[in-house]
């Protein structure tokens, strides 16, 4: 019988996936920037300029979101090391095991998450 991975393993795996995603997005962004520099520099009058600008902004936004997700994962790992993992950062109550299984980096219980929306 194989035991399921613990929170540290889940968070570590998610961290690796997120770092890989950031690296891929940064490579994509670099490629877009290089392509834009090689193409016509006049975005306003170049029919491809708007597309290149959109792709650049889209890749930059995705990379920013991935970096923010990495910070959330790192915060969860810090809470785990400090013995505060599974405790809501808002109300101090427990975070349900089902929520942690679905979102290992969850900072808040379901009640506080619902209130925040």
Go through each PLM region and give its residues.
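Cysteine-rich micro-motifs
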Residues: 105-114
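Short, intrinsically disordered, low-complexity terminal/loop segments
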Residues: 1, 116-117
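Interaction interfaces in information-processing and related assembly proteins
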Residues: 1-82, 102
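Short, cysteine/histidine-rich loop/knuckle motifs that typically chelate Zn2+
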Residues: 89-91, 111
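Short functional micro-motifs and their immediate structural scaffolds
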Residues: 95-96, 117
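Short, non-ligating residues that shape and space the ligands of small metal-coordination modules
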Residues: 97-101
